[in-house]
Amino acid sequence: MAHHDPIGLIAPNAGLAQLNERSRDIFRQIVESYLATGEPVGSRNISRLIAVPLSPASVRNVMSDLEQLGLIYAPHTSAGRLPTELGLRFFVDALMQVGDLTEPERQSIQSQLASVGKAQSVEAALEEALTRLSGLTRTAAVVLTAKSNVRLKHIEFVRLEPDKALVVLVAEDGQVENRVLTLPSGVPASALTEASNFLNARIRGRTLAEARLELETALAQSKAELDQLTQKIVAAGIASWSGGDSDDRQLIVRGHANLLEDLHAMEDLERVRLLFDDLETKREVIDLLGRAERADGVRIFIGSENKLFSLSGSSTIIAPYSDGAGHIVGVLGVIGPTRLNYARVIPMVDYAARIVSQMLGR
């Protein structure tokens, strides 16, 4: 069963803990009706759904109490009620039963990733994981991966101009990264070759982060072996790998079109337009997903609990994934309307993250 952590953004309310079974049952029916249809539900329908028979008038009294607690509200167009963000958070943390995936759902995620993982790069496998997750959950799926965790295979310096060279980094999974490097004046071809040999002897099988540490130590110990120009090239090559913050993080989004399904009104269309705008603000999305790297298990952000998606009224369900050494190297998950099927989506995100971790550990 998937584990998820309440994020503690909403102050505990003593009244919530004191809800009796009848109030919880009515509240659960309001939320489940909303998650299924997106429409407000009235007291007459609720009285037909609950386990213990109650008149619509009695249901209305309970709904009034729930409204005072801030768990539900009445939209201006309807006599029915909808859950608030606080209500959804209370439902997810206290009332919802998170189930296990069906065997076909597990197989769908696992088999697709297994076939890609054998033949292609990690990036291709992550994209396939997103496509599969997006299709199963009918949401936009996202992954944030740290490039510094890619394992290196080879480095080469290619002279472009007298004072410029291309640094070509080849990873074990086939990814190629190019950086332009400014050379010290008067660098002979032999210095570029010597720098390449020095680096290649020490980087194979290491991540960028590991390689930087190893090479900084090795460079300090090997200065007597290398002439000054070669030392400068090696040092410049190491520095070029650091890049900017955005270079060290890669954001992939799949399944935008799923967000256009099941729109109920013009305000739904406006909400999705705002969400598309939010997804374009790459830096903020990266910052949000980065928060999950410090979490144990699935994280859930509902509506305004997360500033980025507050205007579009969206929910985010994300989980970290690890490499073979157990180090967290990225985050994957889904973004969609607050009307997500949380009980179904949470275990899917959790399972996809675990399968990606297994794949990276092979």
Swiss-Prot record:
InterPro entries: GAF-like_dom_sf, HrcA, HrcA_C, WH-like_DNA-bd_sf, WH_DNA-bd_sf, WHTH_transcript_rep_HrcA_IDD. Keywords: Repressor, Stress response, Transcription, Transcription regulation. Negative regulator of class I heat shock genes (grpE-dnaK-dnaJ and groELS operons). Prevents heat-shock induction of these operons. It comes from the Bacteria. HAMAP family: HrcA. GO terms for molecular function: DNA binding. The gene is hrcA. This is Heat-inducible transcription repressor HrcA. One of its GO terms (biological process) is negative regulation of DNA-templated transcription. PANTHER family: HEAT-INDUCIBLE TRANSCRIPTION REPRESSOR HRCA. Disulfide bonds: none annotated. Belongs to the HrcA family.
